[in-house]
Amino acid sequence: MRRACAIVLCTLALLPLHAAPAGAVRQIPRTVRRGTVSRPDIVRKMIPFGRKRLRQTAAYSQRHYGRRTYVLSDPHVIVEHYTDGTSFESAWHLFASNATHLGEKPGTCAHFIIDTDGTIYQLVPLDVRCRHAIGLNQTSIGIEHVGTSDRQILHNRRMMRSSLHLTLWLMQTYGVNVGNVIGHAESLDSPYHRERYRSWRCMTHSDWLRPDMKVYRRRLRDLARRDGVPAGAGPAWDPDCG
């Protein structure tokens, strides 16, 4: 009996703690958190994120998502970006500066930056929200890649090896479905996209367009199959722009 209870408790521990946000029409179910993916090598180079920036993040969340918090809990989405620059240092300094963006604080940031040599840098703790994708900051992890185009990154073997490893590890850790690994340019179609400002609701970027993300997700799915990480179905698009 004791062993049976332990098995039940272990099974429950693998399940997602929170249901998907209400109102999403075609949300992709979470996957069970299992697999054999090891944590990739990650260099911690954290940007300044003191009490003031945390308060700014909480206030931003109140304005745009209706809840005052800076905490990122139970993320459902992983968003791929590129820096539109040629060096890790320039991107890091931009995020560290906390410069006003679109007239608001906090400044933009991402949880990770992958350099051209494949080095993975972590900038922000994974339980803190980062302002990297309008409408998704409340439920997503942001990964930047140093570069100026999707194709440039797709053809850099070292970057792609690191990017896929990191993303797959995050999928395994948080139970994120491959259909919820998206490019920034796909953000408006995510079933998790929520934005209270009508004038911001259709804002997005052109990094990681859908044709290139199809290639990325196909590679990711192949690796997930190899490493025993449930990839699930998807994507299931549910546009929030309008």
Please place each PLM-identified region on the residue numbering.
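Positively charged n-region of N-terminal signal peptides that target proteins for export
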Residues: 1-4
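Bacterial N-terminal signal peptides
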Residues: 7-16
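N-terminal catalytic cores of peptidoglycan-degrading enzymes
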Residues: 22-133
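Basic/polar, cationic surfaces and motifs that engage anionic cell-wall
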Residues: 25-54, 149-242
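Second-shell loop/turn segments in exported
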Residues: 65-67, 109, 147-157
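Solvent-exposed, acidic/flexible segments
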Residues: 71-73, 105, 136, 152-160
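Short coil-to-beta-strand
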Residues: 134-145
